[in-house]
């Protein structure tokens, strides 16, 4: 009941028909984040793309200037010295066939998966499990790499991965309600800038169509896309 009252009060605070300036939207999303935990602030971007076409896919990995406020659990497929390097860098789970067996058994104790190139034949067999969860290592995202230390460190320091869904919408957590407003603004601008730079060649017409902010338990707050440089 308290949850419903909070949501109703938050919805009454937000004008759903208004597109707010970025600073105002940030202040509002922080104001309505009244849960008893530190809510995640999420951004949603509606893009003028059709991800069903290969030349219109938008996907990437970005290190936010102020981190996300969340510590990712990192899993690494590696052997020998590279496995030791991963552990030393702070990876949560490291292994080869033993880790693959755990994944096949449903034990997926990581939020980001990294692999050395020689492990991809093994990891490839886990595609049906890792793929739908967005955990499949990808060389384009820097998660298939010999620089295991760098990849683990980056993941632990506030990297966010983004990928357009079928409707051309991208969601990403860009901080916590406890963040200062200017820190959230820096993260948001960095994220939107990265998405704009990732504009695919096949995209036609207006690319960045809509933007919104929300907290874990709060309503969506529309953001005026003119707050961001045209992309």
Swiss-Prot record:
Subunit and partners: Part of the 50S ribosomal subunit.
Keyword annotations of the record: Repressor, Ribonucleoprotein, Ribosomal protein, RNA-binding, rRNA-binding, Translation regulation, tRNA-binding
A UniProt-annotated Pfam family: Ribosomal_L1
Protein family: Belongs to the universal ribosomal protein uL1 family.
GO-annotated molecular function: rRNA binding; structural constituent of ribosome; tRNA binding
SUPFAM superfamilies: Ribosomal protein L1
Record flagged with keyword Membrane: no
Taxonomic source organism: Gluconacetobacter diazotrophicus (strain ATCC 49037 / DSM 5601 / CCUG 37298 / CIP 103539 / LMG 7603 / PAl5)
GO biological process terms held by the UniProt record: regulation of translation; translation
Family matches, as InterPro entries: Ribosom_uL1_bac-type, Ribosomal_uL1, Ribosomal_uL1-like, Ribosomal_uL1/biogenesis, Ribosomal_uL1_3-a/b-sand, Ribosomal_uL1_CS
Protein's recorded name: Large ribosomal subunit protein uL1
PANTHER family recorded: 54S RIBOSOMAL PROTEIN L1, MITOCHONDRIAL, LARGE RIBOSOMAL SUBUNIT PROTEIN UL1M
Function, as annotated: Binds directly to 23S rRNA. The L1 stalk is quite mobile in the ribosome, and is involved in E site tRNA release.
Alphabetical list of Gene3D superfamilies matching this protein: 3.30.190.20, 3.40.50.790
Gene Ontology cellular component annotations, sorted alphabetically: cytosolic large ribosomal subunit
The keyword tRNA-binding belongs to this UniProt entry's keyword annotation: yes
């Amino acid at each position: 009941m308290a949850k419903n009252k909070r949501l109703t009060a938050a919805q009454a605070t937000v004008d759903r028909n208004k597109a707010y300036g970025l600073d105002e939207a940030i202040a509002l999303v922080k104001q309505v984040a009244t849960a008893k935990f530190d809510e995640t602030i999420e951004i949603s971007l509606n893009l003028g793309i059709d991800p069903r076409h290969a030349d219109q896919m938008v996907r990437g990995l970005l290190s936010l200037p102020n981190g996300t406020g969340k510590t990712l659990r990192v899993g690494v497929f590696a052997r020998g010295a590279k496995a030791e390097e991963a552990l030393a860098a702070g990876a949560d789970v490291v292994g080869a066939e033993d880790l693959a067996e755990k994944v096949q058994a449903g034990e997926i104790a990581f939020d980001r998966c990294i692999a050395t190139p020689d492990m991809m034949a093994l990891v490839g067999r886990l595609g049906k499990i890792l793929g739908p969860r967005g955990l499949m290592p990808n060389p384009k995202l820097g998660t298939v790499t010999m620089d295991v230390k760098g990849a683990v460190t980056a993941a632990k320091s506030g990297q966010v991965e983004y990928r357009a869904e079928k409707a051309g919408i991208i969601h990403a957590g860009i901080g916590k309600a406890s963040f200062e407003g200017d820190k959230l603004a820096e993260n948001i601008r960095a994220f939107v800038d990265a998405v704009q730079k990732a504009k695919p060649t096949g995209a036609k017409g207006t690319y960045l169509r809509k933007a919104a902010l929300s907290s874990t338990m709060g309503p969506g707050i529309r953001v005026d896309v003119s707050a961001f440089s045209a992309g």
